Amino acid sequence: MATLDFTTKPLALVIYMSVVLLLMVGVPLLFSS
């Protein structure tokens, strides 16, 4: 069902990737500080 959302709504994929990148960058920064 996830692939269906991404094919029908490319914007959802862009938002998902942005959130993942923010988490990957932000979480280590929070723990380091």
Curated annotation (Swiss-Prot):
It comes from Saccharomyces cerevisiae (strain ATCC 204508 / S288c) (Baker's yeast). The keyword Transmembrane helix applies. The chain crosses the membrane at residues 11-31. It is found in: Membrane. This is Uncharacterized protein YPR159C-A. Its main location: membrane. One of its GO terms (cellular component) is cytosol. Keywords: Membrane, Transmembrane, Transmembrane helix. It is a single-pass membrane protein.
